């Protein structure tokens, strides 16, 4: 990563490291390949996503339940597409 990261970008990247393989499999590729070049609106949405609790994230990624915002659901689908094609 670049030394030119903003404080907010550093925080989001740090928070994206969950230590939970089921979530990291989606977050890691996105952070490494797409996050820094994403539009500001998508970065803000990803920041909101990584601020959620692990049990909620697991339910959303495994489609047990849906996130409260349609935008979060769309971002989750995008992250899943990056991994599964």
UniProtKB/Swiss-Prot annotation:
Cellular localization per UniProt: Cytoplasm
Function noted in UniProt: An FAD assembly protein, which accelerates covalent attachment of the cofactor into other proteins. Plays an essential role in the assembly of succinate dehydrogenase (SDH, respiratory complex II), an enzyme complex that is a component of both the tricarboxylic acid cycle and the electron transport chain, and which couples the oxidation of succinate to fumarate with the reduction of ubiquinone (coenzyme Q) to ubiquinol. Required for flavinylation (covalent attachment of FAD) of the flavoprotein subunit SdhA of SDH and other flavinylated proteins as well.
Stored Pfam families: Sdh5 (PF03937)
Predominant localisation class: cytoplasm
Similarity comment: Belongs to the SdhE FAD assembly factor family.
Lineage: Bacteria, Pseudomonadati, Pseudomonadota, Gammaproteobacteria, Moraxellales
A single Gene Ontology CC term: cytoplasm
PANTHER family linked to this entry: FAD ASSEMBLY FACTOR SDHE
Keywords per UniProt: Chaperone, Cytoplasm
Name of this chain's protein: FAD assembly factor SdhE
Annotated GO biological process: succinate metabolic process
Database matches in InterPro entries: SDH (IPR005631), SDH_sf (IPR036714), SdhE_FAD_assembly_factor (IPR050531)
Domain of life: Bacteria
């Amino acid at each position: 990563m670049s030394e030119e990261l903003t404080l907010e970008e550093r925080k989001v990247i740090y928070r994206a490291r969950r230590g939970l393989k089921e979530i990291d499999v989606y977050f890691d590729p996105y952070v490494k390949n797409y996050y820094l070049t994403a539009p500001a609106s998508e970065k803000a949405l990803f920041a909101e996503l990584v601020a959620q609790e692990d049990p909620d994230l697991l339910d959303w990624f495994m489609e047990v339940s849906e996130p409260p915002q349609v935008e979060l659901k769309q971002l989750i689908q995008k992250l899943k597409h990056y991994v599964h094609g």
